[in-house]
Swiss-Prot record:
The lineage of its organism: Eukaryota, Fungi, Dikarya, Ascomycota, Saccharomycotina. The chain crosses the membrane at residues 73-89, 125-141. Belongs to the MGR1 family. It is a multi-pass membrane protein. Residues 90-124 are mitochondrial matrix. Component of the mitochondrial inner membrane i-AAA protease complex. Residues 1-49 are annotated as: Disordered. It comes from Candida albicans (strain SC5314 / ATCC MYA-2876) (Yeast). This is Mitochondrial inner membrane i-AAA protease complex subunit MGR1. Its main location: mitochondrion. Residues 1-72, 142-368 are mitochondrial intermembrane. Residues 9-20 have a biased composition (Basic and acidic residues). It is found in: Mitochondrion inner membrane.
Length: 368
């Protein structure tokens, strides 16, 4: 985007100075106004905006907490916090050891046992144990959060990191694009994870007509990952159901194999004669509605934003934020703004050209 700034004109500057002097002579200047009329506003950024606010569950590092999509850094900080917690446990054990008064010296009476006392006070031992327990428990909570199959904070951090790259910024590899957004609060994170767990429970239920198990059975009826026969529902939560139905990795592997077989079958049978040479006749048949590849029951969505379902407003908002059509349009659009100055000399030049044009026409007529 280019902006043309006209050069200053000496005549305009002189007129402006005359107007300023006339206005100053007519109107007295108030004594309280010490700044000039063309003062520049200085923007002072908020210092709090430069402090990272990455979310965490059990880490104690505060602003040093890495971004949620920086998994190696998160694992490193979790391990460091766990090691520090173990160090407090070791320190408490050292303080709780018993030692004899005056050290291990030879007692005058061998039958008398030496008097033992603790190395440190009880309050130091209790404080070390509490601190070590808090650090170890916090690192365990953070590890559970990082190992979840679905983490809203991870998706949020990754989304805004991509947005920062699109805008031409280079986000920090450790802290992420923390200047672009404020992370969601813990309550919103809990609600999103709870909704995800409920959806997973619905997908793995065999009684649900639109479940994930029926989809896999349609793609491969001979699959041994999900049992086709009805089984008595055993007591237990989602982990027990996942264990009975099969792991997601096994289901994905089986679906991938079934899709590969279907593609090979289509390429060798129905789409065997589909080449670039007969592309024009095939397109004509498709436009005329006479092709065998047309599904009359297929209803095309009015808005297509990738291979994602948009059954409700939340899913539509998620897809819209992921694809960012307005941001892509802004990046693909180029702006060129030109400012043409207007001054008194331009009108005089135009009048001179109009006056000279009849003379040139007469000269050309005489020459012909």
């Amino acid at each position: 985007m280019g902006v043309y700034i006209p050069p200053p004109n000496d005549k305009d500057d002189g007129d402006k100075k005359k107007q300023d002097t006339n206005s100053n002579t007519n109107q007295p200047t108030p004594p309280s106004s010490s700044s000039p009329s063309g003062s520049t506003t200085i923007y002072i950024p908020n210092p709090a905006s430069s402090i990272p606010r990455n979310p965490k569950v059990g880490l104690i590092w505060g602003p040093l907490t890495p971004a949620s999509d920086n998994l190696p850094a998160l694992y490193s900080m979790i391990g460091l916090q766990f090691v520090i917690g173990c160090g407090f446990f070791k320190y408490a054990r050292t303080l709780s050891r018993l030692r004899p008064i005056g050290g291990f010296q030879q007692q005058p009476h061998a039958h008398m046992a030496p008097k033992l006392v603790r190395t440190g006070p009880i309050w130091k031992i209790a404080l070390s144990v509490i601190t070590g327990s808090a650090l170890s428990f916090g690192s365990g909570l953070e590890l559970c959060r990082v190992t979840l199959p679905y983490d809203p904070w991870y998706d949020e951090a990754q989304h805004y990191r991509r947005m920062a790259v699109k805008n031409g910024d280079k986000p920090s590899s450790w802290f992420g694009a923390y200047r672009y957004y404020k992370p969601m609060d813990f309550k919103t994170w809990i609600d999103k994870v709870g909704d995800w767990i409920e959806n997973v429970e619905k997908e793995i239920k065999i009684d649900d007509p639109a479940n994930f198990a029926n989809l896999s059975l349609e793609l491969g009826k001979n699959s041994n990952v999900i049992n086709v026969q009805r089984q008595p529902q055993t007591s237990g939560g989602i982990l027990n159901k996942l264990n009975n139905k099969g792991k997601y990795l096994e289901i994905y592997t089986k679906l991938n194999e079934n899709n590969t077989k279907r593609w090979e079958k289509l390429l060798h049978e129905d789409l065997n004669e589909v080449t670039e040479l007969n592309k024009a006749p095939r397109l004509d048949l498709i436009l005329e509605g006479k092709s065998d590849l047309i599904n009359p029951e297929f209803t095309k969505s009015a808005i297509i934003l990738g291979n994602h379902t948009m059954d409700d407003d939340d899913q539509f908002e998620m897809v819209w934020l992921n694809f960012e059509p307005w941001d892509e349009l802004k990046l693909d659009t180029e702006y060129d703004i030109r400012l043409v100055p207007s001054y008194a000399g331009a009108t005089e030049e135009i009048e001179n050209e109009d006056q000279e044009s009849p003379l040139t026409d007469n000269v050309v007529a005489k020459q012909t």
